[in-house]
Amino acid sequence: MIDLLQETDFDVRQLEGVEATDEQFDAPTERVTSPIPVLYQSGYLTIKGYDPEFQVYRLAYPNGEVRKGFIESLLPAYLELPGQSSTFYVVSFIRDLRKGDIESCLERTRSFFASIPNDLENKTEKHYQTIFYLLFRLMGMYVDSEVKSAV
């Protein structure tokens, strides 16, 4: 599933209320071009609403526990944290923030970016946004990046 997300270059930040049509759910597995049906079939997404006018389903994580578990499983696919699990890394980061230990937070952030392999083929701005989204989402923060506004 993680491979499918990366192969399709799907923006995981969009999973918080993604929409899908009947056609997306009916595609045979070998012709799936979107990870949405697979995430739904796997239980990572559930139907939260339906718009009968446009025949569109609104999908989201069924609960916070599923979202957290899914995001934890994604983090290692986007970066390597040598000798640490992503959960331990996030917990340490949160503890440093709560203590007001900004220097340790900055050091962790530097280490975090240093752990991203230099030879990534898809090392784009979106890749970095995804990493930050995953990290801060695991910390329990609501994250939006590049929000367009009229101001």
State each model region's role.
Residues M1-V151:
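Extended alpha-helical interface modules used as scaffolds for assembling large macromolecular complexes
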